[in-house]
Amino acid sequence: HNVITLDPMLFEDDDKSQYLYFTTWGIFDGFGCGVAKLKDGEFDVNALPAGIKRDARRWHEDRPFPIAADSFFCEKRLIPNTELKDVFEAPFVFKRNGIYYLTYSSGSCHTDTYRVQYATSTEGPMGPFTYRGEILTTNENETVHGPGHHSILNIGDNYYIVYHRHNNPKSVHGFNRQVCVDRLSFD
């Protein structure tokens, strides 16, 4: 698919199959997030894929490794906006108790509309997904303002969300941010 892609996130399932998630800034009609299943053995976390140069400054000029190459993936899916709501960036996927959680940032990263939302799937890492709601938002007294662009950590039996939010008092256009960690709870 010829789309803008950003904020890639690699997820490895229990069977060692790997999935690459990305967002599109929500500028395409009908979808804002995509997922591609990598062919077995295509991505080794201990080695750079063939063609990627260690000099990252030149990588974008030479483009030796076209991430969208059909030969790299065995399955691709654009996740429709009927499954996710207001996708902007920063997809993050994790699995807990057989449920796949697809989390992502929504709104403008410069305002109080920036937030983290999520959807779940019991069928697999490619969905279909069911939208579930918001995880992090600007609170009423704005001590938490514009939270987003997160990751989820699993440490023992606990889950934590690591994200940034605008400095308080609020920074102009959200350019100054704080890194935060909060414990996640599940209903």
Regions found by a protein language model. Give the residues of each.
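Carbohydrate-active catalytic/glycan-binding domains of CAZyme proteins
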Residues: 1-187
